[in-house]
Amino acid sequence: MSNLLKEFNEQQIKLLSNREIPKFKSGDTLRVTMKIFDSAGERIQTFEGVCIKKRNNGLHSSFTLRKISYNESIQLQIFLYSPTIESIEVVKFGKVRRAKLYYMLSLFGKSARIKERIDRSKKSS
């Protein structure tokens, strides 16, 4: 039974992953473009925030983004293989030591900033 579910999940992932999904971790700043359906029709909305957590669970993989707008914290949980997602772009790579950044939920202002991770494997010439 579990093999059937595993095969089904793999097939659905292949069908839904027609776009490029970048590699990212918690602490990275992401820009997600998604379709929003409302009474006026369909529009494209961009959400940019820090990835608080990432959950790898096959077809049900998701990640949570957090941004601060007008001194209000906004969190958005997004499913990785959702058909409403147009694109995912990594803006900055963050340097953190945790997989789940729940301590960030109570931070505002300068204390909520994350240092940028510099990839030293690429040699600048």
Swiss-Prot record:
GO molecular function annotation: structural constituent of ribosome
Disulfide links within the chain: none
SUPFAM superfamilies in alphabetical order: Translation proteins SH3-like domain
One Pfam family recorded for the sequence: Ribosomal_L19
Superkingdom: Bacteria
Summary of the function given for this chain in its UniProt record: This protein is located at the 30S-50S ribosomal subunit interface and may play a role in the structure and function of the aminoacyl-tRNA binding site.
Name of the protein in its database record: Large ribosomal subunit protein bL19
